[in-house]
């Protein structure tokens, strides 16, 4: 079986093990806001564990802490990314914000984190980094000059590749090599996991606006961050619980529903885009084509 076949199969089955255990074919939508429990001590333990970033507990207690529909969608993305954990949010920008907030909580001194970022980057991400809405110290660097921008307080390197909407590309592995022990987050929204998996190139975090390819049908907003670092996963869930920026179960259901067709959709989109780019490049009225 080829790698392409593997991805097609993974996309169909990802996040569905618990569905099969329920004796169902399609994932159900769990819209409960609270969950009953018989043991107050177990509920208290679960609340504490989930509030501090655990992925599961004896009981969900409250939908802001855990929701089975959201968890299945997260598992599906994690399997496609080759990650151990995915944390879902209400939007791509909620995911970006959570990464920046988690960066601070993971520092022992809780000092203002220094972030090295590469432009071009998604416009609202750029705004978030420069607007002082978050207590983050940002240095902008060229992709080949990241090492020169690093400081002892540098807590994160942030890139987007391909960039939205310019399609500028950044060599992920080259950035990771320059970053050393500093975590690298890659906004890979324009290159879904069937095209690019940043963790395979050494990135600590892979981020997507699920509103684009992952949702794929123009009817869902969401954001996801995938990682195989347990501390990061816990910190990201902690931020989500504390800020309430959770993905609604119905949106999670729609995103998960879209996973089986992701490889086919991306393949067809790439084929159409290639044909269109070829035609535009040959047109005398077109000065430049970014593809």
Labelled PLM ranges:
Residues 1-57:
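N-terminal glycine-rich, Lys/His-bearing helix-loop that initiates the first secondary-structure elements
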Residues 51-56, 231, 282-285:
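Short, glycine- and charge-enriched coil/turn segments that flank and shape catalytic ligand pockets
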Residues 12, 62, 214:
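Short clusters of hydrophobic/aromatic residues that line enzyme substrate/ligand-binding pockets
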Residues 24-25, 71, 82, 219:
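Short, basic and Ser/Thr-rich N-terminal targeting/leader segments
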Residues 5-11, 74-79, 202-204, 208:
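Short, hydrophobic/aliphatic alpha-helical segments
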Residues 27, 33, 221-222, 287:
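Structural beta-strand/beta-sheet cores of well-ordered domains, especially the beta-sheet scaffolds
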Residues 34, 39-97, 124-131:
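Conserved N-terminal alpha-helix of the aminotransferase class I/II PLP-enzyme fold
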Residues 17-20, 85-283, 290:
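Conserved PLP-enzyme active-site core in the AAT-like
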């Amino acid at each position: 079986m080829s790698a392409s076949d593997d991805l097609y199969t993974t996309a169909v089955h990802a996040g569905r093990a618990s569905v099969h255990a329920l004796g169902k074919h399609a994932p159900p939508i769990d819209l409960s806001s609270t969950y009953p429990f018989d043991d107050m001590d177990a509920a208290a333990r679960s609340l504490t564990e989930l509030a501090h970033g655990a992925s599961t507990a004896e009981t969900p207690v409250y939908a802001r802490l855990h929701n089975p529909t959201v968890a299945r969608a997260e598992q599906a993305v994690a399997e496609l990314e080759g990650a151990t954990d995915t944390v879902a949010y209400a939007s791509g920008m909620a995911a970006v914000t959570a990464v920046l907030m988690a960066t601070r909580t993971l520092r022992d001194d809780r000092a203002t984190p220094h972030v090295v970022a590469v432009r071009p980057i998604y416009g609202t991400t750029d705004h978030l980094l420069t607007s002082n809405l978050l207590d983050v110290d940002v240095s902008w660097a060229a992709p080949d000059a990241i090492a020169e921008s690093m400081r002892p307080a540098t807590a994160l390197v942030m890139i987007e590749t391909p960039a939205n909407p310019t399609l500028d590309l950044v060599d992920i592995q080259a950035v990771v090599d320059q970053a050393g022990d500093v975590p690298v987050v890659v906004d890979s929204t324009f290159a879904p996991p069937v095209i690019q998996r940043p963790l395979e190139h050494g990135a600590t975090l892979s981020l997507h606006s699920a509103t684009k390819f992952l949702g794929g049908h123009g009817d869902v907003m969401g954001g996801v961050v995938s990682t195989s670092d347990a501390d990061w996963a816990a910190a990201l869930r902690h931020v989500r619980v504390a800020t309430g920026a959770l993905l609604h179960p119905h949106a999670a259901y729609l995103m998960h529903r879209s996973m089986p067709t992701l490889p086919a959709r991306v393949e067809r989109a790439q084929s159409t885009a290639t044909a269109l780019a070829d035609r535009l490049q040959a047109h005398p009225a077109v000065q430049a084509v970014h593809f």
